[in-house]
A protein has these predicted regions:
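Extracytoplasmic ligand/sensor domains, especially the bilobed periplasmic-binding protein
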Residues: 1-87, 137-162
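Structural motif
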Residues: 34-38, 91-104
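Short, well-structured alpha-helical segments in soluble
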Residues: 43-47, 96-109
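A conserved active-site cap/scaffold subdomain adjacent to cofactor or substrate pockets
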Residues: 116-123, 143
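Extracellular/periplasmic bilobal clamshell ligand-binding domains
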Residues: 208-220
Length: 220
């Protein structure tokens, strides 16, 4: 309809490959969620005098478009690095049990385990990694924050690499919100029922700000 849309929550890269000229976002898309984990695995190999291609990767992903977008980007990176993809599993639809994948992980001993299953998948992964005493040098996943894995499973989650769109401790500032800590404090003051602020709220605030700035810049 030719009406600009500033969206705050949809991160799937497929939203931005359909030619939607009026769709804009304030958040990182799925292709930017977990590449840092593979780069870290490559750096770890190089630090001990081995090539990045020596890294062995295990992945387990939910079958939804969001997770499949993330997987597609990682598969390309794995090929570019020449790494070995030793496990490439799709998680069960109800996300309540990933012991089959973790049993393979125990047997194959990959250098990095990457998981994307939204909040429920993250919680299941953390719980079963703890229960099954899984020991992988690098474990990376999405939705750690929403699943509160560091609070609920502190032993298992120590050392997890967790993607997030926003954290209150970042020291950057702007004229609208001040620092992330300032905005975090203001949000809690306005909404005292929140003990912790969801990153979705920060994204939503940023989207409103961008919308305002765009219309002012266009004199619309």
């Amino acid at each position: 309809f030719g009406v600009p849309m500033i969206e705050a929550e949809g991160a799937s890269r497929s939203l931005f490959t359909q030619g939607y000229k009026y769709l804009f976002a304030v958040l990182s898309t799925t292709d930017l969620y977990l590449p840092g984990a593979l780069n870290f695995a490559a750096d770890q190999k190089k630090s001990i005098g081995k090539p990045a291609s020596d890294a062995r990767v295990a992945m387990a992903f939910e079958g939804d478009p969001f997770s499949m977008d993330i997987r597609a980007g990682l598969v390309e990176m794995i090929k570019d690095y020449g790494m070995k993809l030793v496990i490439d599993d799709q998680l069960p639809a109800d996300l309540s049990d990933m012991s089959t994948t973790l049993t393979k992980v125990k047997a194959l001993k990959p250098d990095i385990l990457i998981i994307s299953g939204h909040s429920k998948g993250a919680a299941t992964a953390a719980r079963q990694i703890d229960e099954m005493k899984i020991n992988v040098p690098i474990i990376a996943m999405t939705h750690c924050e929403a699943a509160k894995v560091h609070e609920k499973f502190p032993n298992a989650a120590t050392g997890f690499l967790c993607t997030t769109q926003w954290v209150p401790g970042i020291d950057k500032k702007d004229a609208m919100f001040g620092s992330a800590a300032d905005w975090n404090a203001d949000f809690k003051a306005a909404h005292p029922s929140y003990s912790s602020v969801p990153y979705q709220s920060a994204q939503a605030s940023a989207a409103v700000y961008v919308w305002k700035e765009a219309f002012e810049a266009a004199n619309s």
